[in-house]
Amino acid sequence: MKVCLDEDISPDVAAILRSMGVNATSVHEAGRQGFSDREQLELASAEGRVLVTRNRNDFILLTQEFFAKGLPHAGVLILPWTIPPDNFRLVARRIAQYVKRAGDSPSEYLFDFV
C-alpha cells in the first residue's frame, strides 16, 4: 500500500515512514499545499496512493460522492486527533502498522481509521 499524507500531517512523518520501508509521500513534499480536498483525493488516487488525513468529515462526504459517481478512489485513512500531531514517530508507527496489516492492495473506496 502506498500512502500520501494530507496537509494536516507533517512531512516529517513521511520521511519516518520511508525509513520504515513504507512507500510514503506528502502533500507538502509534492508542493500541493492549498489544493482542495477533492484535488488531493484525485491526485492521490491517480498515483494509486491511499490518502492519510485527520479531516474525517470532509473525506466521508467525498468518498460517498466518488463512489456514487464511479470516480477513481484509492482510499482514505483517518488518523484520529487522539494521536498527538507532534509525536511524529507515534503517528508513523500507527500508519506503518496499518499498512503492514493491509498488504499491497487496498480495496477501492477504502475508508478506515488508523
Predicted feature residues:
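Acidic, metal-binding active-site segment of PIN/NYN-like and related structure-specific nucleases
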Residues: 37, 43-62
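Detector for Asparagine
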Residues: 23, 55-57, 87
